Structures are given as C-alpha cells and as structure tokens.
Amino acid sequence: QVGADGDLNGMVWYNGFNMAEMGSGYGLKKLGLEHLHPIIARGILLDIAAVRGVEVMEVGDVITMADVTAALKAQGQSGYKMLPGDAILFHTGWDQYWIVDNAKYNSGCPGIGMEVARWIAGGHAGVTGFDTWPGDAVPNPDPDCAFCVHQYLQTRHGIINQENLNTSLLVDA
C-alpha cells in the first residue's frame, strides 16, 4: 500500500486499487481489516537481535537470509520448512522505543530486505509480523528500494503485514 512518493493518494494497493477506489479520510471502502477472518496460523518468531548479539538492532540494518538461518539454528529450528499460511515474526528489539522514545522509534528502523521478502512470498506465508513500524529497513541502503518489501509482500502477494508488535514479550517468555 505504498506508492513511489510514500503514503500519498497516487499509491496502488493490493489488486491494483487506487486511493479514490479505496476510501477517503473517513475510512476504507475496500480491503478494510473488518473483512479479514480471524487468523489462526502456525507461527515462528525469529529473534534476529539475539543472533546479532545485540539488545536492539540499528536504524537501517537489513535482515538477511543468513540472519534468518542463524536464528532458526539458534532456536533449535534448523529443519524448519515454511508451510502455506505460516506467520513469520521478526524481533529486532526496536519495540523498546515504542511510546518511551517516539522520536527514536519513528526515526527509521531495522527490517527485512528483498532476499527475505522473496523467501516469505515463495513459501506462501500468510502473515508477517514486526516490532517496527514498516517491516522494511529504513532508510534502506538500496536507494531504489523505498518500502519495496511492503510493495512486494502486500501489493504483489497479498501477505498481511502486522507492525508495531511487542515481540519482546514473546522472546522473554
């Protein structure tokens, strides 16, 4: 749901809808969350901060497939095979800034790159979850990749992105 200029009226949403077709300042006419069924899925939380040896990743850090593989191994899930509909959650530690330091939280964030996005889409995951606000690394080190993860997962593949999750509660459990 992101266009070339960010979240503006010229953007294209899933199935090619534009903002005029989607809704107005008063809400959505199409593709609103009220149309989603409850999500019941097998899920896996990938603690990327832990495999990087940090409490919190840095602004612009890109999560790679090497990170995913290392997290699966560290969590005793080396044999993990994604099944259609799986929920793939990422912990970067960024959620520690939510409400406590909104300027820092919104200044950018770590996130997945296109390599991981292709893995998610190729495995037909149904949902992704992030402790960041976009899921993408911001700023992205690739100048041609402004919210390209959003565009790829949501617009092209219809994968639901859950953002601003408190994944710290899960890794601490």
Predicted features and spans:
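Active-/binding-site microenvironments in catalytic and ligand-binding cores
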Residues: 1-173
